[in-house]
Regions:
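N-terminal Rossmann-like NAD(P)+-binding domain of SDR-like oxidoreductases, especially those catalyzing
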Residues: 1
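Active-site and donor-binding regions of nucleotide-sugar-utilizing enzymes
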Residues: 4-26, 63-164, 175
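Structural beta-sheet core signal
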Residues: 5, 32-34, 121, 169, ...
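Residue-level signal for short, function-critical loop segments
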Residues: 9, 36-38, 125, 212-213
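Conserved nucleotide-sugar phosphate-binding/catalytic loop shared by glycosyltransferases and other
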Residues: 29-73, 83
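A nucleotide-sugar donor-handling region in carbohydrate enzymes
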Residues: 39-44, 143-219
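Charged helix-capping and loop-helix junction motifs
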Residues: 133, 220-221
Length: 221
């Protein structure tokens, strides 16, 4: 059996990395396809992070057009669709592994479905509240196995009409990654010094995570 892991940005790599590590440890055959933001210098060229984590990226699909607005983004997705079809024809994976709610993952799910390639979807059934949420649920309609991270997502998938035997309540893989990631915890001292947080353990604090709204990219600063 061969698994093909598909990833388009740093944001979903944390979902995929711990699963890939299990595949690596158990000698399960897999390939990685990296596309979109992973290959762009303007977004940090996060392909290097994948390679730094010890994984070889066999397939790269350059899809992004200059300009980065709604129209170039949409046209880029169709470029991806054509290239990913060729990849599946060459690679012939037994399963496609997708994560999250990004547009490129939606395109990959459509291609996989129409080439009769089974799809497993990580963190299916969650709510994003914008077009990303629509993409997530659309991916779910093409997927054959749904990995839910929490009971609410599990119940939502059932309400969306998915068969119970296809839904697995497994938790969020990035939390496993965070818990076992020695690089993060070994660097806590330097992180506290850099951001003047030496006394963090002695007081209450609130951690705020910012996530831009896809439809409002012009307002993002």
């Amino acid at each position: 059996m061969k698994l093909l892991f598909f990833t388009g940005s740093r944001s979903e790599w944390g979902y995929i990395r711990p699963i890939l590590q299990i595949c690596k440890n158990k000698k399960i055959k897999y390939e990685i396809c990296a596309t979109n933001m992973h290959l762009l210098d303007s977004f940090g060229n996060s392909l290097k992070e994948i390679e730094k984590d010890g994984f070889k990226v066999k397939e790269k699909i350059y899809m992004a057009l200059d300009g980065y607005n709604n129209f170039t983004m949409t046209k880029s997705l169709f470029i991806l669709g054509s290239s990913f079809t060729d990849l599946i024809y060459r690679s012939k994976p037994d399963w496609i592994i997708l994560a999250g709610d990004r547009g490129e993952s939606l395109v990959a799910s459509i291609v996989a479905a129409y080439t009769n390639t089974p799809i497993a979807h990580i963190q299916a059934g969650e709510l994003s509240g914008n077009i990303d949420g629509q993409a997530r649920h659309a991916i779910g309609k093409f997927a054959h196995i749904h990995f839910a991270s929490n009971p609410d997502a599990y119940k939502r998938l059932i309400k969306l009409g998915e068969e119970k035997f296809r839904i697995k309540l497994v938790g969020a893989p990035q939390l496993d990654d965070l818990k076992s990631n020695k690089r993060i915890f070994n660097n806590l001292t330097s992180i506290k010094q850099k951001y003047n947080l030496e006394n963090l353990d002695k007081k209450d604090y609130l951690l705020v995570v910012y996530h831009p709204v896809t439809e409002e990219f012009r307002k993002t600063r």
